[in-house]
C-alpha cells in the first residue's frame, strides 16, 4: 500500500465516521507565536481545545504536514542516521471536540489498523496510563486485546501525572491520559516492550497515540474533570507506511525511495544506502514545504532554521562530490510524489526551485574554502574543533554551527560550543561598541531639549550641552575618540520617518568633530554621532554646526519624490496602496507598499510619467504645522497604525498631501529627473520600488544610452534603427534555424534508411536500437514515425546526444504493444543513462545525463524485447 493510498484510506475512514476532513495547515502556525513550526496535527486546533475558537464541526480528521527542526522539537542532527528521525513528516489525526470519547476513539483505531490496513492483531499492543482503568477495560473487555498486551505506564517523570502516558498542554490547563498503540516487529529485532529497560530498541514501534483531554489541572497539581472531554490522536504516516510496505526503515518507503533515487541521480551516487542521500531526501521535503509556506532563507528566526537545513543538505551533496547546485533539481521529484496531496506544493514548484537554487548558489561560493579550513583544523590529533574556528566558519563562510558539528560527528570529534558562544558574544559586544551611538537607551540625558533649525538653515551657531563617550557622559572628547555631541541648537536632521540622519561637522577654532549620523536620544534631543577628528571638544564650547549640504539636498530630492510617487501609485494601482515602510538616503528612495501583485512594466511607465509631470510643473512645496484634528480635515494622507502627536506637520508637494516631519525641496522642479530602478516583492502582499532622482537618474539614463549606441554600432546601424535591425537579424536567425532543421531532417532520414538494414528479428518483432548523429528530439520523432511505417511490426529505440545530454524516443507498432510497451522500453534504456521517462504504449520519450552508458544500453534492447515477446 503506497503512501497516497494510506492517506486516502485514513481520511475516508474517519469521514465515514462523521468527521470533517480539514486541510493541512501551514508549517508556520497562525495561532501560536510561541511555536516556531507546526509540529503536530493538533496545532491548528489548539484554540478550539482552549475554548477560544469554535468550529462548525465537532469531529475532524486531517493529514498534517509537520516540522521538527528548531527549538525544543529538533531532530536535525539525527536525520539520516536513524531509521525514523525526520525534519518533515506527515501526521494522520482525528479529533473530537466534546463529541465522542475513549470508547469510540480506541475502537475506531483498532478497526482502521486491523480491518482497513490489515495489520495482524497479534502484532499490536497498547499502553495506558496506570490510573486509566476505563481505557484498560475498553482494550481488554471490548476490543479483546489480551491483558498481557495492554501495558500500564506509571508516573515515570518524577511526579504525579508526570508520565509518558499522561499528556499536558502546559503546566496548567487541559490534560489527560493517553493510550499508545505499538507494532511488534518480532523477536529477531532487538528491544523490549514499552515500560521495560529495553524499550528504546527497534522491536516495538509506536504508531498511534490517542490523547484523552478529560481534566483541567490547577496550579497545585490537582485535576478536575473538563465539562466537555476531547480526543486528540496522531499517527506518523512514515512509520505506518514502513509497516504496511514491509520495510524496517522509514527511508525505505515509497516516497523516500523515490527521493533517494533522485538524490542519487543528481549526485551521481550509485550506493543508495548512503546516509547522505537520506539526509538530502529528508531535507528537500522540509525546505520545499517551508518555501511554499512563505519561509525564505535568512539569518534569523524561521528563516535561519530553513537556511540551516538547506546548507546541511548541500554539505552532504558536497561530501558526495557535488561542486555545483543540485539540491533544487529535486523539487520536481518531490512534486511527483506529494503534489497531488499538497496542491500548493505543485502550484509553487517554480518559486520553490528558484528560492532553493539562489540559496545553493550563495553557499557554494564559500563552501569549498570553508571545508578546507575545517579539514585543516581537524587534521592531526585534534579531538575538538576550537570554538574560534567554528565561529569563523559561521561568520565568514556561512556554516551553521550544527553543520560543523555534523562534520565533526562523522569523524568522531566534537565542537567547543562554549568557545563558539564566547566568540559570538565577543563579536556582538564589538558590534554594540561600534554602533553604540545607535543605541539611544545607552545614553541618559537630563537637560533641556534642543532647537531644530534645519528646515531653514544648514549652518547654526550653537553651544555644546552634552558629550558622551562609550555611552557615559564626559566633560570633553579628545582627538580620535568616537562619541556623541548634544547641542542646544542644531540644523542636523535626526533619522526619522525613513529619512536618514544628516552628516557634517561641528567645529570651533582648532577643534573639529565629524558627524557621521544624527539620531534622537529623546523626542526633542538630537545626538550627533561621530569622531573627534581635531583638538578637544568640551561641554560649554561655542561651535559652528554645519550640515553636508550636497548630501542633504540629494536626500531631500529622494524624500520629496517619495511623496509624489506614493500619490501616483494610489492613482495607478488603486486606493488600497498604503505605505509599509521606506528608506530615504542620498542615493535612492526605497518604498514598500501594500499591493497583491507585481507592478507591470506598463504601470511603472505610467507612474514615472505622472511623477515627472509633477516635477515639470515646478510647483511650490508648502509645510504647515497644526493640530491633528485640523490636519485630518485637510484630507492629508495618514498612515494606518502610525502614532501621531497632538501637533503635526502637513506637507503639500505637487498634488500630494501627507503628514511628514522630514526635510524637502522648495519646489518640485528641484527633484530633477525621476526613474524607477526596480520593483520586487518583499513579503506576502507587500511590494517594493527603488527609485533615483537628479544626477543619479541622469547618469543612469546616460549609461543606458551608451549601451544602446554600443549595441547599434555592433549591429552596424543607428540607435533609432536598432529595434527593426534586431528584428531583421532575429528573422534571419529563425530562417537559418529552419534551414538547419530541414538539413537535420534530411540527414536523419538518410540515416533512417541506412538503419533499416540494422533491424534484427526477435520472435517476429523487428528490433532496432541506434543513435542518430546531430538529431534533436523533433528529428528523432519524425524518423521514428518513418521507421515504424517501413518496419511494420517493430520495437524501436532512437537516441541522440547533444552537449552531453541523452535524448531517447521509443516506438512500438500497434500489433506489438500487447507484448512490449514503449514506456517500459524507453525506461529500460533511460535508467542506464541516468534518466527516466514515460509516454504512451506506442510512443515514449526520455532523457538522461550519462551518455557513457548509452552503447551498452542500446545493445541490451534486443535481449530485453526477447524476454517479453
Swiss-Prot record:
It comes from Janthinobacterium sp. (strain Marseille). GO terms for biological process: alanyl-tRNA aminoacylation; negative regulation of DNA-templated transcription. Its EC number is 6.1.1.7. Binds 1 zinc ion per subunit. Its cofactor is Zn(2+). GO terms for molecular function: alanine-tRNA ligase activity; aminoacyl-tRNA deacylase activity; ATP binding; tRNA binding; zinc ion binding. Zn(2+) binds at residues 559, 563, 660, 664. InterPro entries: aa-tRNA-synth_II/BPL/LPL, Ala-tRNA-lgiase_IIc, Ala-tRNA-ligase_IIc_anticod-bd, Ala-tRNA-synth_IIc_core, Ala-tRNA-synth_IIc_N, Ala-tRNA_ligase, Ala_tRNA_ligase_euk/bac, DHHA1_dom. It is an enzyme of class 6 (ligase). It is found in: Cytoplasm. The keyword Membrane does not apply. Keywords: Aminoacyl-tRNA synthetase, ATP-binding, Cytoplasm, Ligase, Metal-binding, Nucleotide-binding, Protein biosynthesis, RNA-binding, tRNA-binding, Zinc. Belongs to the class-II aminoacyl-tRNA synthetase family. GO terms for cellular component: cytosol. Catalyzes the attachment of alanine to tRNA(Ala) in a two-step reaction: alanine is first activated by ATP to form Ala-AMP and then transferred to the acceptor end of tRNA(Ala). Also edits incorrectly charged Ser-tRNA(Ala) and Gly-tRNA(Ala) via its editing domain. Consists of three domains; the N-terminal catalytic domain, the editing domain and the C-terminal C-Ala domain. The editing domain removes incorrectly charged amino acids, while the C-Ala domain, along with tRNA(Ala), serves as a bridge to cooperatively bring together the editing and aminoacylation centers thus stimulating deacylation of misacylated tRNAs. Pfam families: DHHA1, tRNA-synt_2c, tRNA_SAD. This is Alanine--tRNA ligase. NCBIfam families: alaS. Transmembrane segments: none annotated. The keyword Lyase does not apply. It catalyses: tRNA(Ala) + L-alanine + ATP = L-alanyl-tRNA(Ala) + AMP + diphosphate.
